[in-house]
């Protein structure tokens, strides 16, 4: 299974993805947006640069999924169409987890993506303003049967 955490920078994607791996899926592979950018030397935050980074993460996740591995991805991945096409490609074997928060300051607001397209259907909504990371993880585990 692929667990795809999406949301604005600073929303808690990486924290929740790391907790999911640590507590419930220790053998899963982790793909993180910042690490992908370092690995492929992609510091281009334009729309094309983001699409390229997300496409690379999707290819790696798809490959690992085809090998029977669980994959946990945490990426801003702001483009709805790109995420939906990936879900269709994998016959909807992806759990999309939309991580967001209220208007509080978290320290990475300068990296926010203008025009981020929130999921519209077939996703789990996690508002990290309303619960601790462990409470959010409990919701993920319960709703997705991890």
Label each PLM-derived region with a short phrase.
Residues 8:
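P-loop (Walker A) phosphate-binding loop of NTP-binding proteins
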Residues 24, 89-92, 121:
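Short, structured coil segments at secondary-structure junctions
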Residues 5:
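Hydrophobic anchor at the beta1->P-loop junction of P-loop NTPases
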Residues 28-30, 94-98, 123-125:
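Conserved beta-strand scaffold positions in the cores of enzyme catalytic domains, especially
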Residues 100-146:
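Small-molecule kinase domains that catalyze NTP-dependent phosphoryl transfer to phosphate-bearing small molecules
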Residues 2:
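Walker A (P-loop) ATP-phosphate-binding motif of ABC ATPase nucleotide-binding domains
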Residues 11, 17-62, 66:
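Conserved substrate/cofactor phosphate-moiety recognition/catalytic segment
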Residues 47-91, 95, 101-104:
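Glycine-rich phosphate-binding loop used to anchor ATP phosphates in small-molecule kinases
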């Amino acid at each position: 299974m692929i667990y795809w955490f999406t949301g604005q920078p600073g929303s808690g994607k990486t924290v929740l993805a790391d907790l999911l791996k640590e507590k419930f899926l220790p053998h899963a592979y982790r793909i993180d947006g910042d690490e992908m950018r370092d690995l492929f030397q992609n510091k281009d935050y334009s729309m094309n640069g983001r699409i390229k980074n997300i496409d690379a993460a999707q290819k790696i996740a798809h490959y690992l999924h085809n090998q029977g591995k669980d994959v946990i991805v945490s990426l801003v991945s702001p483009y709805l169409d790109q995420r939906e096409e990936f879900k269709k490609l994998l016959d909807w074997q992806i759990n999309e987890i939309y991580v967001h928060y209220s208007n509080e300051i978290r320290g990475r607001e300068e990296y926010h993506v203008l025009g981020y397209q929130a999921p519209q259907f077939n996703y789990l909504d996690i508002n990290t303003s309303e619960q601790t990371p462990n409470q959010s993880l409990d919701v993920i585990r319960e709703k997705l049967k991890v």
